[in-house]
A protein has these predicted regions:
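Short hydrophobic/aromatic beta-strand or adjacent loop that forms the aromatic wall/cage
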Residues: 272, 369-376
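A conserved beta-strand-loop-helix scaffold within acyl/acetyltransferase catalytic domains
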Residues: 259-305
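Conserved acetyl-CoA pyrophosphate-binding loop and the N-cap/start of the following alpha-helix
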Residues: 307, 311-319, 329
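Conserved catalytic-core motifs of GNAT/GCN5-like acyltransferases
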Residues: 333-335, 346, 351-370
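Conserved GNAT acetyl-CoA-binding A-motif
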Residues: 324-337
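Residue-level detector of beta-propeller blades
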Residues: 161-164, 283, 352
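C-terminal catalytic "cap/lid" subdomain
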Residues: 1-261, 265-266, 309
Length: 379
C-alpha cells in the first residue's frame, strides 16, 4: 500500500509538472519574507520549466549575496535592482526593462526584481508595495499565477471554509472577514479581486515556508489559498485524455477506503461509463453511471478537495439521474460506506434498500462484506 501511495504521489507530481510547463509564475516576497527558505522551491519549479519571476524587497541589501551563493550552487537567478523606487502607480515600472526579463525567462533563468526603498504599509497604503509591483509585473508578462507570500495566509486559510475562492465569491468576503475578527485581511481581498478583474487568472496567498510553494503547484490539495477568476463549467463525457486526472481524483477516496482501488486499465476499459465535471478545461469532479439491466448505478464520486462544498457533486449526480431517465432506466442506485454520502443521496430522493434487492449481476461482482449501505431512486 505504501508503494502505491508513492507511485500516486509521483504521478501527481509529473501530471502538474507537465500541466504548468512553460507557464509564467510571478512570486511577490515582501520585506522579511524568508527568501533563503524558498530557494529549493524556486529551483524545483525552474527545473521543470516553469518560468519564475521573483519580486522582492531588499531593504538590508542582502538579496544580492544570497543570489550569488545560490548561483554558485547551480541556480540561475538574474538580479535586477530597482534602487529607491517610488511606489506611485504611474511610475512603478519605469525603471524595469521587460524585454530583459522576457529574454532571461526564455533562457531558463529566474529574474529577481528587487528594490531598496518604498513606503511602509499603512492605513493610507494598506497593500504591501511588493504585492502591487508583483501584480503589475504579472499583468505585463501575462503570468498564469501571482503568488503573494505573507504571514496572513495561514490565518486566512483557517478562517475560510475552503482553500479556493472564485471572483464571484469575493464580493461579500470582506464583510465576513471584518465580522469574524480579520479586518486586516479586507484590503488584501479587495486588492486580489481587483487583480482578477484586470486579467490575472490565479492569485495565490501563501505562507513563506519551505515546501509550501512546491505543494501548492504540484499537489491536488495545495498549501495556500487559491483565488481564481470566475470560469466556465460544464459536465461532459470522460475521454482517454482524462484517465490520469481521473486516477488522481479518485486517489483520496481510495486511500480512505470509501472507494475500492481502481486501476487505470479498468478506467480505460470502462471510460464510456464516466462523466467529468470540468472548470475552464480542468477536471475537478467525476462520477460513473453503470448499467445493470433496468437499473443504473451511480458510482465513484470524487471531487478535487479545494473545489468541494459548492454543490458540484450534487449537480453532477442530478445530471446523471436525468441521463439514466433519458436512457430508459427504471431505477438508479448507489452505495457508500460514508455516512455523509448516505445523507447526500437521501437529499436527492434516494431511499435506503437492502443490498440483496439489487440486481443479481451487480451482486455477483460486489464484495458484500464491505459495510456499505445501498440507496435507490425510482425514475
Amino acid at each position: 500500500m505504501e508503494e502505491t501511495k508513492e507511485l500516486f504521489r509521483a504521478l501527481e507530481f509529473a501530471h502538474y509538472a507537465e500541466r504548468f510547463r512553460d507557464s509564467i509564475f510571478v512570486i511577490a516576497l515582501p520585506a522579511g519574507a524568508p527568501f533563503s527558505d524558498l530557494l529549493l522551491d524556486f529551483k524545483v519549479l525552474a527545473g521543470y520549466r516553469i518560468r519564475v519571476v521573483l519580486v522582492t524587497s531588499d531593504p538590508d541589501f542582502q538579496i544580492e549575496q544570497v543570489i550569488s551563493q545560490a548561483n554558485q550552487r547551480g541556480s540561475r537567478f538574474l538580479l535586477s535592482l530597482l534602487t529607491d523606487l517610488l511606489f506611485r502607480p504611474e511610475e512603478e515600472l519605469l525603471n524595469l526593462d521587460f524585454q530583459r526579463v522576457a529574454t532571461s525567462l526564455e533562457q531558463g533563468r529566474m529574474p529577481v526584481i528587487a528594490y531598496h526603498g518604498a513606503e511602509a504599509v499603512s492605513a493610507a497604503h494598506p497593500i504591501d508595495p511588493t504585492y502591487r509591483l508583483g501584480a503589475q509585473v504579472a499583468l505585463r508578462l501575462g503570468a498564469q499565477k501571482l503568488f503573494l507570500v505573507g504571514r496572513l495566509a495561514a490565518t486566512l486559510r483557517s478562517a475560510l471554509p475552503r482553500s479556493s475562492v472564485q471572483a464571484s465569491e469575493l464580493e461579500g468576503l470582506p464583510d465576513r472577514l471584518a465580522a469574524t475578527g480579520l479586518p486586516q485581511a479586507v484590503p488584501l481581498c479587495t486588492f486580489i479581486a481587483a487583480q482578477l478583474a484586470l486579467g490575472i487568472p490565479d492569485v495565490v496567498l501563501l505562507e513563506g515556508r519551505s515546501g509550501h510553494l512546491f505543494r501548492e503547484v504540484f499537489t491536488y490539495d495545495g498549501a495556500g489559498i487559491l483565488f481564481t477568476a470566475t470560469r466556465a463549467s460544464r459536465i461532459r463525457r470522460a475521454g482517454m485524455r482524462d484517465v490520469t486526472d481521473m486516477t488522481l481524483l479518485l486517489r483520496p477516496e481510495v486511500e480512505s477506503g470509501a472507494i475500492l482501488p481502481v486501476l487505470e486499465s479498468r478506467i480505460e476499459a470502462n471510460i464510456d461509463n464516466y462523466w467529468i465535471y470540468e472548470i475552464d478545461g480542468m477536471p475537478v469532479g467525476l462520477a460513473g453511471l453503470k448499467r445493470y439491466g433496468e437499473y443504473a448505478e451511480l458510482a465513484q464520486f470524487a471531487t478535487l478537495p479545494r473545489y468541494r462544498g459548492r454543490g458540484r457533486a450534487r449537480e453532477l449526480a442530478q445530471f446523471l439521474v436525468e441521463q439514466a431517465r433519458a436512457q430508459g432506466f427504471r431505477f438508479v442506485f448507489a452505495l457508500s460506506i460514508d455516512p455523509r454520502m448516505w445523507e447526500f443521496f437521501q437529499y436527492l430522493g434516494f431511499q435506503p434498500i437492502d443490498r440483496e434487492e439489487l440486481p443479481a449481476d451487480w451482486r455477483g461482482g460486489y464484495d458484500l462484506s464491505r459495510p456499505s449501505r445501498a440507496l435507490l431512486k425510482e425514475l
